[in-house]
Amino acid sequence: MAFTPFPPRQPTASARLPLTLITLDDWALATITGADSEKYMQGQVTADVSQMTEDQHLLAAHCDAKGKMWSNLRLFRDGDGFAWIERRSVREPQLTELKKYAVFSKVTIAPDDERVLLGVAGFQARAALANLFSELPSKEKQVVKEGATTLLWFEHPAERFLIVTDEATANMLTDKLRGEAELNNSQQWLALNIEAGFPVIDAANSGQFIPQATNLQALGGISFKKGCYTGQEMVARAKFRGANKRALWLLTGSASRLPEAGEDLELKMGENWRRTGTVLAAVKLEDGQVVVQVVMNNDMEPDSIFRVRDDANTLHIEPLPYSLEE
């Protein structure tokens, strides 16, 4: 990507975030084009893409035959096919898996590094963008296209926008917003996704979890009414037989070091500590607070106390902005 990522600053929680323009270099774009695009994706991901309109974006999972996620995808219609955004660390293996059956279909599946991914979040993000685009996405119309640019709208943890555009427009936006907006890198968007409860699947956790273990059903990412797709049997069994015992949790507190993706945490049991869970992502905020996204048993007590392994500091559960009640 010729567009240079912005230098890192410590991320800020959404409630205190000033207007910020963010380069999403840890995320990557991929596309599927061709006459069979919709049919092909319908047979590969958990969401019902046949029901998707031009105005929607969805979080969907791409699973293996056992229902474990290679990746999750932020999916939207693009040209005569679809585009999706996922963590850069999983894009190459995810595309390799997706292409396995493509020889039988009229589709072209490819990474897209020509376009640039930017985020706009923080104080009066909408007002800042209103001067630059003729229409902005909203709750009713979550995707807006203008020229070479696609804008995606997110409600949580506070209104924010993801911009998929060409290099020239990315440079124009940077020039226009540089004076009023702070600039930051992917860590800020990651912090917002953790706060929003959007599961982050990096390479360390690819092929490890069924979608429901990361709350995808609560985020509208799984259709239980659509036809066959890879891994469907296991995903359906987890719902209808209650086979899923895990959920995605948000923890905050302090830690002397950031836990890495794939690492476990420790849960306080009386005087002792017991290993539990798998970390998906963690970020340290500018106020020193640590936010951790972790998959654990879905019956954790809300007042449970956790820590990074052998650490002197503790973490506790924060509520997510959505419900897991079915």
Swiss-Prot record:
Main location: cytoplasm
Binding sites annotated in the UniProt record for folate: W27, W189
InterPro entries assigned to the protein according to its UniProt record, in alphabetical order: GCV_T_N, GcvT/YgfZ_C, tRNA-modifying_YgfZ, YgfZ/GcvT, YgfZ/GcvT_CS, YgfZ_barrel
Keyword Cytoplasm: yes
GO CC terms: cytoplasm
Keyword tRNA processing: yes
GO MF term list: folic acid binding
Subcellular location: Cytoplasm
GO BP: any one term: tRNA processing
Keywords: Cytoplasm, Folate-binding, tRNA processing
SUPFAM superfamilies, alphabetized: Aminomethyltransferase beta-barrel domain (SSF101790), Folate-binding domain (SSF103025)
Role description: Folate-binding protein involved in regulating the level of ATP-DnaA and in the modification of some tRNAs. It is probably a key factor in regulatory networks that act via tRNA modification, such as initiation of chromosomal replication.
PANTHER family assigned: TRANSFERASE CAF17, MITOCHONDRIAL-RELATED (PTHR22602:SF0)
Family, as annotated: Belongs to the tRNA-modifying YgfZ family.
NCBIfam families: PRK09559.1, ygfZ_signature
UniProt protein name: tRNA-modifying protein YgfZ
Lineage of source species: Bacteria, Pseudomonadati, Pseudomonadota, Gammaproteobacteria, Enterobacterales
Gene name of the encoded protein: ygfZ
